[in-house]
């Protein structure tokens, strides 16, 4: 897979590909990347890429010409082009999986109040929000998408590890709690079942804890899980 990122601040993006597991994935040729500076395509002598919004209002808007020129440069219309925005489609593990099947992605990093709608209308295939909150940096949101996608590529992560993670496709539950040495820490001990060596009992304990954590922290996912297995615990609303 190749990922192209369009950004006003490329220096935020580049280090992500040069460290830890991502560097290994790049070195092994599983993923390639290109970071494009939008400012390089601005015809303004100061390389400005924003302007005041038509109709008035707070903040500045990213101008269409420099981003359009950058998108034409990378031939974006032949690839899956994403704009990260708080008004986009909510990002999920399923969407990450769908994107991992694409051969090339182009991600536009938003800034300021937003992007001229005409760029979205002309070039963007998918407008994506990484959560119900607002970030000052579209680069941060872009890295969330990149990190979640590359892990699903063949050869990047051990497949067995992916099956046990939160939001895995077999059940959609959050992941169970983890423990490592020491056995006792500040009066808290590792659950005995994890030391028992009984793999079926460990598997059962982890599943129960996974359900409990999902019900507590993500009741919406818990209800989806109940719907999937065709059961109801009698609750009509959160406790």
Swiss-Prot record:
Q: Where in the cell is it found?
A: Cytoplasm
Principal subcellular localization: cytoplasm
- Residues recorded as binding S-adenosyl-L-methionine, renumbered to this chain, are 110, 130-135
Q: Which GO biological-process labels does this protein carry?
A: tRNA N1-guanine methylation
User: Which top-level enzyme class is recorded in the Swiss-Prot or TrEMBL entry?
Assistant: transferase
Which GO terms of the molecular function aspect are on file?
A: tRNA (guanine(37)-N1)-methyltransferase activity
Q: Which GO terms describe its cellular component?
A: cytosol
Q: Which keywords, in A-to-Z order, does the entry hold?
A: Cytoplasm, Methyltransferase, S-adenosyl-L-methionine, Transferase, tRNA processing
Q: List the disulfide bonds.
A: none
The protein's matches in Pfam families, at most eight in alphabetical order, are given as: tRNA_m1G_MT (PF01746)
Among CDD domains, the record links this protein to:
TrmD-like
> What EC number(s) are associated with this protein in UniProt?
2.1.1.228
Q: SUPFAM superfamilies, from UniProt?
A: alpha/beta knot (SSF75217)
* InterPro entries associated with the record: Alpha/beta_knot_MTases, tRNA_m1G_MeTrfase_C_sf, tRNA_m1G_MeTrfase_TrmD, tRNA_m1G_MTases_N, tRNA_MeTrfase_TRMD/TRM10
Reaction catalysis annotation: guanosine(37) in tRNA + S-adenosyl-L-methionine = N(1)-methylguanosine(37) in tRNA + S-adenosyl-L-homocysteine + H(+)
Give the family this protein belongs to, as stated in its UniProt record: Belongs to the RNA methyltransferase TrmD family.
Q: How does it assemble?
A: Homodimer.
Function as written in the Swiss-Prot or TrEMBL entry = Specifically methylates guanosine-37 in various tRNAs.
- Protein name (record): tRNA (guanine-N(1)-)-methyltransferase
